[in-house]
Amino acid sequence: MHFADFLAGSFGGACGVAVGYPLDTVKVRIQTQKQFTGIWQCIVLTIRKEGVHGFFKGMFLPITTISMTSSVVFGTYRNCLQALSYIRKAENTKLDVFMSGLAGGVAQVSVMSPGDIVKVRLQCQTESRHSVNPKYSVKPKYSGPIHCLLSICREQGLSGLYRGALPLALRDGPSFATYFLTYHTLCARLTPDGQKEPEWTVVLLSGGVAGMSGWAVGTPMDVIKARLQMDGVRGQRRYRGLLHCLTVTTRTEGLGVFFRSLGINCLRAFPVNMVVFAVYEVSVRVLRSAPLVS
């Protein structure tokens, strides 16, 4: 078993969160709140109402959880590749890469869902204790990640932490399959024959493009996931489930709403996944050179 990939994935994921969190907050608000009509309008209103602090609401828990989920994704991916190669007694194909990425994306949902719903709810909480404008000074519902986590458990039970888990799996399975296939293909194409490891410029470019392609696939289901996670926070629940949310959203807002945050997803994904893969590659090479880690 490749243990190094679990650790390296954890390091890469944590660094990626730190880089991309402000734009992730903007993305979630655009997806779930009609008052925000575009990227710059959302950024300006957030700064005016909440200050810079508004972009970092709920970041502590995602750094912890995404560190774990990224570990699961990369570790599962690498070990699935190893298993498929061993079973077939042959080199891995692109289909192997795709299926291993799919397995990694689905596997991490059980770990990711609780932290993700807390992240989304805190990001969509526009009331701020740190408001820079007194007229916007309204007490927020959640005082922080732990309070939000406990409030969800108290109001909805443990199952509330997994509201939106199905669309999360439907988002991350195909998204990570595309993600790893894109990275693998670009690295292979851009690395000269006979060279064992890709150059760092290739790693950075391939990681950035992989992130964008993964989000291009995952954005529509990401909208559904975010809406289900926010449903009922400000009153009565609107959606009965995934299909009902999909139907109502399409009927009332049109198909375009599923791609409203695609631009910011791609804008955020490129630098984030440059960092994720760069840190992952550095870490995995160092760890594999250590005598006790394979």
Curated annotation (Swiss-Prot):
> In what way does this protein cross or attach to the membrane?
Multi-pass membrane protein
Predominant cellular place of this UniProt entry's protein:
mitochondrion
Q: Which GO terms describe its molecular function?
A: transmembrane transporter activity
Solcar repeat spans: 4-83, 95-189, 198-286
Instruction: Alphabetically list the UniProt keywords.
Output: Membrane, Mitochondrion, Mitochondrion inner membrane, Repeat, Transmembrane, Transmembrane helix, Transport
Signal peptide positions on this chain: none
Please name the Gene3D superfamilies in this protein's record: Mitochondrial carrier domain (1.50.40.10)
Q: Where in the cell is it found?
A: Mitochondrion inner membrane
**Where exactly are the transmembrane stretches of this chain?**
3-23, 54-74, 97-117, 173-193, 200-220, 262-282
User: What GO cellular-component annotations does this UniProt entry give?
Assistant: mitochondrial inner membrane; mitochondrion
- Taxonomically, the superkingdom here is Eukaryota
Q: Which Pfam families match?
A: Mito_carr
The Swiss-Prot or TrEMBL record describes its family as follows:
Belongs to the mitochondrial carrier (TC 2.A.29) family.
Query: Which protein are we looking at?
Result: Solute carrier family 25 member 47-A
